[in-house]
UniProtKB/Swiss-Prot annotation:
Transmembrane segments: none annotated. The keyword Hydrolase applies. It comes from Bos taurus. Belongs to the peptidase S9C family. The active site is at S585, D673, H705. The modification N-acetylmethionine is found at M1. Keywords: Acetylation, Cytoplasm, Hydrolase, Phosphoprotein. One of its GO terms (biological process) is proteolysis. GO terms for cellular component: cytoplasm. Its EC number is 3.4.19.1. The modification Phosphoserine is found at S183, S185. This is Acylamino-acid-releasing enzyme. It is found in: Cytoplasm. The gene is APEH. Homotetramer.
Amino acid sequence: MERQVLLSEPEEAAALYRGLSRQPALSAACLGPEVTTQYGGRYRTVHTEWTQRDLERMENIRFCRQYLVFHDGDSVVFAGPAGNSVETRGELLSRESPSGTMKAVLRKAGSTGEEKQFLEVWEKNRKLKSFNLSALEKHGPVYEDDCFGCLSWSHSETHLLYVAEKKRPKAESFFQTKALDISGSDDEMARPKKPDQAIKGDQFLFYEDWGENMVSKGSPVLCVLDIESGNISVLEGVPESVSPGQAFWAPGDTGVVFAGWWHEPFRLGIRFCTNRRSALYYVDLTGGNCELLSDDSLAVTSPRLSPDQCRIVYLQFPSLVPHQQCGQLCLYDWYTRVTVVVVDVVPRQLGENFSGIYCSLLPLGCWSADSQRVVFDTAQRSRQDLFAVDTQMGTVTPLTAGGSGGSWKLLTIDRDLMVAQFSTPNLPPCLKVGFLPPAGMEQEVVWVSLEEAEPIPDISWSIRVLQPPPEQEHAQYVGLDFEAILIQPSNPPDKTQVPMVVMPHGGPHSSFVTSWMLLPAMLCKMGFAALLVNYRGSTGFGQDSILSLPGNVGSQDVKDVQFAVEQVLQEEHFDAGRVALLGGSHGGFLSCHLIGQYPETYGACVVRNPVINIASMMGSTDIPDWCVVEAGYLYSSDCLPDPNVWSEMLNKSPIKYTPQVKTPVLLMLGQEDRRVPFKQGMEYYRALKARNVPVRLLLYPKSTHSLSEVEVESDSFMNAVIWMCTHLGH
């Protein structure tokens, strides 16, 4: 019988990609103030922000759309769009004032290389104020990221709080003629006489930053803008050893609450790392005193003030251990100064019970109107669901469990009106609203669609639960299972001719959930089945599962993926002679392990910024702690090369299995990757070339670890499918 013909002509694949990549992604939503009509009806506006790939401009564009939600206080009466979408250019951050009468916007303007930042205040139908932050020179660029960045209105709506890079002193050469002062001594010439005078010899002084995707972000400061006067103050009192972020105004505007990350003795990469030592602080605006509000030996993130301004909820994690773990939800009472753990770490899921908190950030709006419950989304095995937590009782109640098995994301909740996103592997994101029911009735949420997406035809999906064989059980953590999401063409002419692409996720402590993902959907439309494996160590399955992997990378995770592949091939009867691998970062690490340890299984391999040699990565990555911890050791900032540790790192690395590799490999590397430097992939490229294994390398000069820029993402997809089609055969 002839093998199934894949959609493999480049022009056909490009046309398919062009169509599917137009699906927009929701990035944010906020709710306007409640309006009562002259007839007594009540409504609120929903302002949403979206991103979409633009293949003509080769960039991600951002646009907004408004909706109206009419309601009767506890249910939605009518909801619909208010006009068409409008592209928003240059907006970095935006935030409505507490009353909803004003809006602050951080905007960049100007040509590339000469961009300036402006902070604008809008009121009704006009721009009330605009401040050229770049020209004022009080600080460096404003942080717009979700790690440190914030834009917070004071409760009085007279001041704005934000985070920016500390202003760096000017520097110049010792031989800068115009700066020489022949009357001064050597000491006087080397020191600035006034704050703005340049320091000689500091032109090439190294400034640390916070690693991958945080280039030039190293020394954040808290800044306050007085809207009336236009005066900007850089707050004092923050400890010298701490980098502040995620700040908001304390009750009564008496000061500022912020999360502070330790940057001594040096900074480590912070993106996707919830384990960086940090704590909660309060800095008094009158006296400049700084007070510690939480345990300073752990890691905290996303403090959120309750509507009654009495409580602060935040997430807490252990520090300097695996990057992503099961977290605690903590509550700090502003007036009693007592902290309690509302939701603790869950070692193991029992039946259908809650398996723990794995999100790295709480939504900016997460409190119920009565300041008693907190709503958030988190992975639960291979799904992502919404939950409500009673902060007094500690009870966790699902809001979206059951149903069609897709995944949810909370965008915001305000006065109990929730705005959420829902999607599945064959359904792009839908925008939904619903009221949070009274306590005890949470599972009765009635969701109303504001923006409905059309399901992508001819794609079906399911979740497979997998139990490792007895010989692969973990000695300490016995009985752990794991899952895989299988996405496949709905009605292939002959299932035995369907090729399969195996996709292990990166991290390793992350997970795939049953949400919309462009790449698996594309592969499925081309005729492939896609197997997304949540091996033991993935988030969403309890803390025991996460702790089972450090010290066992390169073996336990590899065996889990291979076991999933063999089980699915056996049950689904796909074409076992046409199986490919596609993985990035730790997923690339696993892919390279699999073609070395199981060379007969895989006919093609595509890897993006893979970890190849943990030992050689140690000295160049922004996360050296990852190398040590995942190899099974404890990390400390003063650790030096140890032959035993490095030997273990090498033994757990894919480079060890290179002699067995015969699968054709396509490497895709970002030259600006700080997480897994591209030299890792180069090391593998040379090793394969020396052994005459078919290998191709794509090096993207300005791309980072995720290879997510539109031009890079689209090019890498096309090259990946052509590589797989070529080496698996049509």
